[in-house]
């Protein structure tokens, strides 16, 4: 029994799920379309990156092969140059949705078997009784927004009015979310968190997966930008996840990035929440290297920038550059694995930056598994993300639960 490192590349999907058409996402392919865009020069940006997508280490682990198995097409430049060094496959989500919470819970062995509540794409989006209760219980002068919106666009549109009136900006999307944006200094982080806590309780009867605090800074002259102090208020999982089972067995767990928020801080062990992909990966590798992470321990990290900074913003060059930066760190990840350790790299949904709109895309996800002594080769199609949690449970010496291990 040794340790495990689970890395979720937030939104790095590899092709439309079998039911993508019912979500309006037939043909979506995050990795494939980024690679194709880069191959024809559409991923170039002066001072950032140029040319074809270069992911030699991920390709060697089987990313291109997994994408080809999922879609029937090898993304340009992602065929492995030599022998494959990882066990690779692709997974299909059983939960109905394409959101962060459903994806992560299913990875951890708890597929969502109910429909999340969502707010309609009308204006207003929120039920009047919900809005009125939030205003009254949180002591607000009112709210702004009350619609479906892009988070970056709505703070540009309403940021100055938010500062002037003190009314927070409340908005949603096709996901099961209630998002609240307010100026970090004029409104205050503590007050924003308190308002979100009220909204979390009020949203429970509507089966809303997350209430998200979206602080921003800036002014009307310079523009407004979101800060790294985002906080998610998620509903807790309906049954025991892999994390619950590990903690119950006395195993060490380290949660990096927004993992603690996603699992409502239940059985998430030691939580570390740096800002950005690089800092989150640094923290995960540091935690994995510590002697305190003994046998049976898990480090679970989400790298959110792929989604928030590039997917939602439909930024192909930015997304490509972020993938290349992560790829360059694969040798470092490998070097941190001791004999018996296991690393799994996967994703929670797609967010194709070439797709219409600004929302997630319903996609299959890569499953890349490697470590000293692990035999490379195909894992095939995994019919649920829960197979990932099952494999980790088997590796960490826990009895089987939901899903089917490949180990």
UniProtKB/Swiss-Prot annotation:
HAMAP family named in the record: Phosphopentomut (MF_00740)
UniProt keyword Transmembrane present: no
Catalysed transformations (reactions): 2-deoxy-alpha-D-ribose 1-phosphate = 2-deoxy-D-ribose 5-phosphate; alpha-D-ribose 1-phosphate = D-ribose 5-phosphate
Protein name per Swiss-Prot or TrEMBL: Phosphopentomutase
Organism: Methylobacterium nodulans (strain LMG 21967 / CNCM I-2342 / ORS 2060)
Keyword Manganese assigned: yes
Keywords: Cytoplasm, Isomerase, Manganese, Metal-binding
InterPro entries: Alkaline_phosphatase_core_sf, DeoB, Metalloenzyme, Phosphopentomutase_DeoB_cap_sf
EC annotation from Swiss-Prot or TrEMBL: 5.4.2.7
UniProt cofactor(s): Mn(2+)
Functional note: Isomerase that catalyzes the conversion of deoxy-ribose 1-phosphate (dRib-1-P) and ribose 1-phosphate (Rib-1-P) to deoxy-ribose 5-phosphate (dRib-5-P) and ribose 5-phosphate (Rib-5-P), respectively.
Gene Ontology molecular function: any one: magnesium ion binding
Domain of life: Bacteria
Enzyme class, broadest EC rank: isomerase
Signal peptide span: none
Membrane spanning residue stretches: none
CDD domains in the record: PPM
Any single GO CC term annotated in Swiss-Prot or TrEMBL for this entry: cytosol
Compartment annotation: Cytoplasm
Gene Ontology BP, a term: 2-deoxyribose 1-phosphate catabolic process
Annotated residues for binding of Mn(2+) 1: 10, 348-349
Family of this protein: Belongs to the phosphopentomutase family.
Coiled-coil intervals: none
Record pathway: Carbohydrate degradation; 2-deoxy-D-ribose 1-phosphate degradation; D-glyceraldehyde 3-phosphate and acetaldehyde from 2-deoxy-alpha-D-ribose 1-phosphate: step 1/2
A Pfam family the protein falls into: Metalloenzyme
């Amino acid at each position: 029994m040794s340790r495990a490192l689970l890395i979720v590349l937030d939104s790095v999907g590899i092709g439309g799920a079998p039911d993508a058409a019912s979500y309006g996402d037939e043909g979506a392919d995050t990795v494939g379309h980024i690679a194709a865009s880069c191959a024809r020069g559409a991923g170039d940006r002066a001072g950032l990156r140029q040319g074809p997508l270069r992911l030699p280490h991920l390709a060697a682990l089987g990313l291109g092969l997994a994408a080809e198995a999922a879609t029937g097409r090898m993304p340009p430049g992602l065929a492995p140059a030599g022998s494959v060094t990882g066990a690779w496959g692709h997974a299909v989500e059983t939960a109905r949705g394409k959101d962060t919470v459903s994806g992560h819970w299913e990875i951890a062995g708890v597929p969502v078997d109910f429909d999340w509540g969502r707010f309609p794409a009308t204006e207003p989006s929120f039920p009047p009784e919900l809005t009125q209760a939030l205003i009254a219980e949180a002591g607000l002068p009112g709210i702004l927004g009350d619609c479906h919106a892009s988070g970056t666009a709505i703070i540009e549109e309403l940021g100055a009015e938010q500062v002037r009136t003190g009314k927070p900006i409340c908005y949603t999307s096709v996901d099961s979310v209630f998002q609240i944006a307010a100026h970090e200094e004029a409104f205050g982080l503590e007050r924003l968190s308190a308002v979100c806590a009220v909204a979390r309780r009020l949203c429970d009867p509507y089966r809303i997966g997350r209430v998200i605090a979206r602080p921003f800074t800036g002014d009307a002259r310079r523009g407004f930008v979101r800060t790294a102090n985002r906080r998610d208020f998620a509903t807790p999982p309906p049954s025991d996840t892999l994390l619950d089972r590990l903690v119950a067995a006395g195993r060490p767990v380290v949660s990096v990035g927004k993992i603690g928020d996603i699992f409502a801080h239940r059985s998430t062990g030691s939580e570390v929440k740096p800002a950005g992909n690089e800092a989150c990966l640094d923290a995960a590798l540091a935690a994995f290297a510590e002697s305190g992470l003994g046998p049976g321990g898990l480090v679970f990290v989400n790298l959110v920038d792929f989604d928030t900074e590039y997917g939602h913003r439909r930024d192909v060059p930015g997304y490509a550059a972020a993938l290349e930066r992560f790829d360059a760190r694969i040798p470092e990840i490998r070097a941190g694995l001791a004999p018996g350790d296991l690393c799994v790299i996967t994703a929670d949904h797609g967010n194709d930056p070439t797709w219409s709109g600004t929302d997630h895309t319903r996609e299959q996800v890569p499953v890349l598994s490697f470590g000293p002594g692990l035999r490379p080769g195909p894992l095939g199609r995994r019919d649920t993300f829960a197979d990932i949690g099952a494999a980790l449970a088997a590796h960490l010496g826990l009895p089987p639960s939901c899903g089917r291990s490949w180990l």
